[in-house]
A protein has these predicted regions:
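Intrinsically disordered, low-complexity cytosolic terminal tails
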Residues: 1-54
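Helix-loop boundary elements of multi-pass alpha-helical membrane proteins
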Residues: 48-90, 301
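Signal-peptide-cleavage-adjacent N-terminal segments of secreted and extracellular proteins
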Residues: 81-172
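Hydrophobic/aromatic-rich, well-ordered segments within soluble, folded domains that form packed cores
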Residues: 131-153, 288-312, 502-505, 685, ...
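Active-site-proximal beta-strand/loop segments in catalytic clefts of secreted hydrolases
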Residues: 145, 278, 597-599
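Short secondary-structure subsegments characteristic of cysteine-rich extracellular domains
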Residues: 159-181, 317-337, 615-621, 723-727
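Intrinsically disordered, low-complexity linker/terminal regions across diverse proteins
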Residues: 170, 327, 333, 353-369, ...
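Noncatalytic, helix-rich "gating/capping" subdomain that lines the substrate-entry/channel surface
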Residues: 176-488, 525-527, 537, 542-559
Length: 790
């Protein structure tokens, strides 16, 4: 509920944690057992074998060969050059003979297919072929067919939990941002871009960070009344309530503990900003880590992590162990009373609008006025309207707080702030975090410092970084192309809408109106090109070159201020809610807009040199995916103006739910054998519906383009039609693999299905795919029973 948009085409936190390491051509892959995805009724399933990641062992056979050539003596080099010259001459003669032979036969042969032989086409064909496993049967396992070689040649780096084409693109983007942020200040810079460069520079200044140490963190904890576990037996509760402490964390450090709070559009009145409350996000990736016996090792690692950090700050180890046992018990209780995410998809069912007086009456265990007034500058009255999304949780949480001693509460509340700061710490603190993440995510080491600093700068000053990025790294023609593709894909959606027989005519007409009313945001907001307006964005943010941790704390205060200042102001529906330099896309239900940042308008998704089949199979499917989000299990609850209301009649709602349940059941039968877990089809249904709808709409739009412009020349050496290339490029977006620990985390906490499932699920539902690859009915990729919503 906290974000104004859906979770994006791909969860961002996965992207920014990645890097690419590729094995040389011809390299042997360490023998491993394959990662298996099974599909079928639970307990009895057919098995689809997917290539398991070969691990972190790297052999560089290609490099070895090159080195041996460079070490040859002069005589050997001359001999080698002679052999190469003869070989080249023979090859040229062979090609000339072939050309002559083909020319002589032109009068008797049928016309050959039109093949594109430009440099761009050759490069594109080579890229597609280099990822494929041509020995795999496309109608049995299209993921292996499309991605088998890519997965075999790309190892998961030690500092990553997964590797994928998405993540490789994000890493390429990071390299560009690194170069931009390291450029000296120049005449084109403004106050905002200078702050971004200063933040990055302070992040890279390790000697200065080491000199300052953890002093800013210690001062912060002291300001908040002291961390009891570190202060020791002499700690006394501060002369203010727990609610005031929670309010200070929210207002000063943008940290939500025990509950989440933000200011945003009212779901039932999207033009008005309102105070909103929701249940807390637990410290570990999902509530399951606290409640399932199978996660005891991760929970123990979490306890060890918090203990080690407290000891580094001066706590007695034995005391810390005992006190954090009580903290873990508290967080277990909070996790237990929280509502599972897959039970929160019906926004209208959990939405509750009430006044502060009503909230206080229904949840009397908490002093709500004290909490809110601590971080809201203007007076709060008992009539202040509030939207709450977790009333049952608040009731239970209030009771837990009442029966928990102040020392344990303060230990937990301040630990959550400390934990959020830990990624920015170095040396011993960093090492303890690495040890924890090794157990939780399988990550064996920390990333390069520059990569971390680029990520943090882009996250914390995203618009300033975006302004730097678009100067020289964004092809403005791609914006016009994307707009045209959005138009054609929206037309395809409306055609499919007209053809479906489960909606009544009135609802269908309203749905078409909503689709046509969607606003599209492509590339970046226009104000990034206006230095004065851009500088206003960060006028309240103070950044210095040589105080990194102080800068981090300043950004947290700025983020809190930036959000809270919207209270009682009308919603700016033209304002972007994401930074431009990110490989992702979004749909915002309260604004009914689709957002495609500059970072995603690059290969594999889009290139001006790609044939249309690849662009429609790439960014086209992304466009269709985001359009479909307006009509998935959550988006369908909002009208064209972004207001939550019932604009479907009951018969149509029932028909939708039946089709959505088909998707839920289908995806719930996919099982990742390596972690022995099924996909949560209920939690991932919105993204799965969008994947299926986006694929169908984009292919229809592509075929309409072909009917107008004709077939494009084929790509050389691939031996695939453009219909086949459309689906191949879609699948190769999802090439990748992940560690078992990461697979477990994603299944438990992510609204997105893992990459292989995002290939196998939509394609096995697609009649267009089955025709393109001539898959027999009943084959794994062309089952007789298919699911279809949009």
């Amino acid at each position: 509920m906290k974000a104004e948009s859906n979770n994006g085409y791909l969860k961002t936190s996965v992207i920014v944690e990645q890097n690419e390491i590729s094995l040389g051509s011809g390299q042997e892959t360490p023998a491993t057992s394959p990662l298996q995805v099974t599909y079928g009724p639970r307990g009895s399933a057919t098995t689809t074998v997917l290539q398991k990641h070969p691990g972190n062992r790297r052999k560089s056979l290609g490099i070895t060969r090159a080195t041996s050539i460079r070490r040859r003596g002069p005589a050997n080099r001359q001999q080698l050059l002679g052999v190469l010259a003869v070989t080249l001459l023979a090859t040229c003669l062979f090609i000339l003979l072939l050309l002559a032979l083909n020319t002589s036969r032109e009068c008797v042969q049928e016309p050959r297919p039109n093949v594109c032989m430009t440099e761009e086409c050759i490069r594109t064909a080579a890229s597609l072929l280099s990822a494929m496993d041509r020995t795999a049967a496309p109608c049995v396992n299209f993921f292996q067919y499309a991605c088998g070689t890519w997965n075999r040649r790309h190892v998961i780096p030690e500092d990553r939990s997964s590797i994928s084409t998405f993540e490789v693109l994000a890493n390429q983007l990071q390299v560009i941002l690194k170069r931009i942020l390291e450029e000296p200040p120049n005449n084109e810079d403004n106050n905002a871009t200078l702050k971004a460069k200063m933040f990055y520079k302070s992040c890279m200044d390790i000697p200065r960070i080491r000199e300052i140490g953890d002093i800013p963190l210690r001062k912060t904890l002291e300001f908040l009344g002291g961390w009891p576990v570190v202060v020791g037996p002499s700690w006394k509760p501060p002369p203010y309530s727990v609610e005031v402490l929670l309010g200070r964390l929210r207002g000063q450090y943008n940290e939500g503990v025990l509950l989440e709070q933000w200011v945003g559009p009212d779901d039932k009145n999207s033009s008005a900003n309102i105070l909103q409350l929701d249940q807390m996000q637990v410290a570990l990736p999902s509530r399951d880590y606290y409640l399932k016996k199978s996660s005891e090792s991760q929970l123990h690692a979490y306890h060890r992590y918090m203990t080690n950090i407290a000891v580094l700050m001066g706590a007695n180890r034995q005391t810390a162990v005992e006190e954090f046992n009580r903290v873990i018990n508290l967080e277990k209780q909070l996790a237990n009373v929280s509502i599972p995410e897959d039970d929160r998809h019906d926004t209208s069912a959990i939405y509750r609008k009430l006044t502060l007086r009503e909230l206080q009456r229904e949840i009397p265990q908490l002093k709500w006025h004290e909490y809110l007034q601590e971080f809201i500058n203007s007076p709060i009255t008992e009539e202040e309207p509030i939207v709450a999304y977790a009333m049952p949780y608040f009731m239970q949480m209030g009771r837990i707080v009442k029966r928990t001693d102040r020392r344990t509460l303060h230990n937990y509340i301040l630990w959550r702030l400390v934990m959020s700061i830990m990624p920015h710490m170095i040396d011993e603190y960093q090492q303890k975090r690495v040890e924890f993440r090794k157990i939780l995510l399988g990550i064996l080491s920390e990333r390069d410092r520059w990569s971390q600093c680029v990520e943090w700068t882009n996250k914390k000053l995203g618009m300033a970084v975006g302004a730097l990025f678009i100067r020289d790294n964004f092809n403005h023609e791609s914006k016009e192309t994307a707009l045209e593709m959005i138009r054609t894909i929206r037309e395809a959606f409306n055609e499919l809408l007209a053809e479906n027989h489960w909606m009544d005519n009135e609802t269908r007409a309203v749905a078409k109106n909503k689709a046509n009313s969607m606003n599209e945001r492509i590339g970046y907001p226009e104000f990034l090109k206006d230095p004065v307006e851009l500088s206003k964005e960060y006028v309240m943010l103070n950044i210095t070159e040589n105080h990194f941790l102080e800068n981090v704390l300043a950004v947290l205060r700025y983020d809190a201020y930036h959000n809270l200042e919207k209270l009682r102001k009308p919603v700016d529906k033209d304002k972007w809610s994401t930074e431009p330099a990110v490989v992702n896309a979004f749909y915002n239900p309260n604004k009914n807009d689709i957002v495609f940042p500059a970072g995603i308008l690059q290969p594999l998704f889009y290139s001006q040199h790609f044939p249309k089949s690849l662009n429609y199979g790439g960014i086209g499917v992304v466009i269709g995916h985001e359009i479909t989000h307006g009509f998935d299990d959550k988006g369908r609850q909002f009208d064209k103006d972004g207001n939550m209301m019932q604009w479907w009649n009951n018969v149509t709602v029932k028909a939708f739910r039946e089709r959505a349940q088909c998707i839920v059941d289908q995806y719930s039968r996919y099982k990742l054998q390596e972690v022995d877990l099924y996909i949560n089809g209920k939690m991932t249904q919105g993204e799965n519906i969008a994947d299926n709808g986006g694929l169908k709409q984009s292919f229809r739009a592509y075929k309409k383009w072909v009917s107008i412009h004709g077939e494009e020349p084929l790509l050389p050496g691939v031996n695939l039609t453009h219909d086949q290339l459309f689906f191949l490029n879609y699948a190769q977006i999802w090439c990748g693999s992940m560690r078992p620990e990461d697979a477990l985390t994603k299944i438990r906490s992510s609204v997105h299905s893992p990459g292989p499932i995002r290939v196998l699920g939509p394609l096995s539902n697609s009649e267009d795919f089955a025709r393109a690859y001539d898959c027999p009915p009943g084959s794994p990729m062309n089952p007789t029973q298919k699911c279809n919503v949009w």
